[in-house]
Each structure stands twice: as C-alpha cells, then as structure tokens.
Amino acid sequence: MIINYKALLDKDDLISLFEWGELSEGGQRNKANKVMKSIREQYKKDKGIDWKDTFIYRNISQNVIPTETFLKCCPEFKKSFRR
C-alpha cells in the first residue's frame, strides 16, 4: 500500500500500511493502538519528552503518531510513502 507522506499518522493509516483489512474492526483498532503506544514510547526515548506534552490539546496526541519516529522504528515501510 502506498500512501501520501504526512507528518502525523492516524489509526486508519496504520491499518492500511500493515494491511489488517481481514481483521475485525475491533482487532484492527487494537493492533493499531499497540503500535501507536510503542511509537510514543520510542519518541520519548529519542526526544526526552512525552509525545502528549508536544500538543496544546491532549486529545490530538492520543489519535496520531509522528511519521518520522514510525519510520525509524519500522524502516521497511519507507517505500510505502509517496512524497
């Protein structure tokens, strides 16, 4: 799956990238949440600051992850982005 490059990824982007279409909607969301949690932890290790602390509005940080950190953790997806 090829998607347009953007700074932030949401759950739907992850579902498309990992091709979880055969799973139930709940299963897709559950797997996406696990990936997002691990990316946020990596962001904190790299930057020394919580991902949620980079946003003024807390609810935004819960729904997206930084693409840069995602690609650092999952370099096999670099070819899945179109700039």
Predicted regions and their residues:
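Short, amphipathic alpha-helical "recognition" segments used to contact nucleic acids or chromatin
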Residues: 1-7
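Helix-turn-helix/homeodomain-like alpha-helical modules used for DNA recognition
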Residues: 72-83
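Polar low-complexity intrinsically disordered regions
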Residues: 1, 45-49, 83
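Residues in the recognition helix of alpha-helical DNA-binding motifs
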Residues: 5, 35, 73
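Major-groove DNA-recognition helix of helix-turn-helix-type DNA-binding domains
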Residues: 17-68, 77
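Residues within the helices of the helix-turn-helix
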Residues: 11-12
